[in-house]
């Protein structure tokens, strides 16, 4: 489970993509009228993530499994059209894969999960190029955990729909002459619904119609999760190199089943701000540009 070769490949891939990107990127959003409306560039990022993972699911096994987690994340942020100075939209989509082993290292447990969130935050611009924002989002995720040791119950299904509280803090600064944007963003589900079978219940029984007690209301007593995201964008020109760290803590307890996930991932990727420009028309030198991050 050595991560060093994986990161070497990631860094080479990111470097190749950054070299291939044109100096002016074009986004698919409808063009703005430069004569009056402020310009709202799309801040987008594509990142690869990898790190450690601890996984418990007592539907499959009482043991704690340890291993690695890898992820791909897409993030899109843009100032809202109705009040771009104060409101910002954020869309994320990610895929995560975990490969873990039991304490004896003679059995593996795999986890695959896909997640998407959309939300809005209200922001406040402070002195010294600091921006604070707070708001909410809606998130949906679905996945499965597979344990090769189990015969009748080898798979546990995960699914949740949540309303979250979120926010961020950014600081626009420099390292020498290199522009740098630092950001910290936590996300915590507040309420929602999630899926869990009964302890020992076979999915074949659910298929036959035994579907009572599968959907549960989520609150911090039975479903707690927090994702902490810390990123640094090194602006190298038209695009930026994004590095950072992500932490994901999740715990669910329902139907005598406990699920726990603790993961730490290093982040490397590319980010940038994109504007749509009408063909044959350049950027108005007097246009007001409102960034989503600062």
Specify the residue positions occupied by each region the protein language model found.
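Cleavable N-terminal export/targeting peptides
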Residues: 1-40, 276-294
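Short glycine/proline- and aromatic-enriched beta-strand/turn motifs that initiate or cap beta-hairpins
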Residues: 26-86, 90, 100, 291-294
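Outer-envelope beta-barrel architecture signal
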Residues: 38-46, 83-91, 128-136, 176-184, ...
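Transmembrane beta-strands of outer-membrane beta-barrel pores
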Residues: 50-56, 93-101, 138-146, 186-194, ...
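Residues that define the transmembrane beta-barrel architecture of outer-membrane proteins
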Residues: 64-72, 108-116, 130, 155-165, ...
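Residues on the lipid-exposed face of transmembrane beta-strands in outer-membrane beta-barrel proteins
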Residues: 70-80, 114-122, 136, 163-171, ...
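Outer-membrane beta-barrel transmembrane domain signature
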Residues: 152-238
């Amino acid at each position: 489970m050595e991560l060093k070769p994986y990161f070497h490949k990631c860094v080479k891939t990111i470097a190749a993509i950054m070299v291939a990107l044109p100096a002016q990127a074009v986004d698919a959003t409808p063009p703005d009228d430069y004569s009056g409306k402020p310009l709202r560039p799309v801040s987008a990022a594509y990142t690869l993530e990898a790190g450690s993972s601890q996984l418990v699911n007592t539907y499959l096994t009482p043991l704690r499994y340890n291993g690695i987690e890898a992820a791909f994340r897409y993030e899109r942020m843009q100032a809202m059209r109705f009040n771009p100075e104060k409101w910002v939209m954020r869309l994320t989509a990610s895929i995560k894969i975990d490969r873990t082993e039991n304490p004896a290292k003679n059995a593996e447990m795999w986890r695959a999960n896909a997640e998407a969130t959309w939300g809005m935050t209200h922001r406040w611009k402070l002195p010294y190029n600091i921006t604070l924002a707070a708001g909410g989002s809606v998130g949906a995720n679905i996945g499965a955990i597979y344990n090769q040791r189990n015969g009748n119950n080898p798979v546990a299904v995960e699914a949740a729909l949540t309303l979250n509280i979120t926010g961020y803090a950014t600081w626009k600064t420099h390292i020498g002459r290199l522009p740098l944007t630092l950001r910290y963003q936590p996300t915590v589900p507040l309420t929602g619904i999630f899926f869990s079978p009964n302890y020992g219940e076979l999915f074949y029984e659910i298929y036959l119609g035994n579907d009572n007690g599968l959907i549960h209301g989520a609150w911090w007593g039975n479903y707690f999760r927090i994702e902490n995201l810390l990123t640094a964008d090194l602006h190298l020109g038209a695009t930026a190199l994004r590095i950072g760290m992500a932490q994901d803590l999740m715990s669910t307890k329902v139907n005598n089943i406990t699920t726990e996930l603790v993961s730490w991932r290093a982040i490397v990727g590319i980010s940038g701000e994109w504007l749509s420009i009408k063909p044959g028309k350049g950027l108005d030198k007097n246009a007001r540009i409102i960034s989503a991050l600062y």
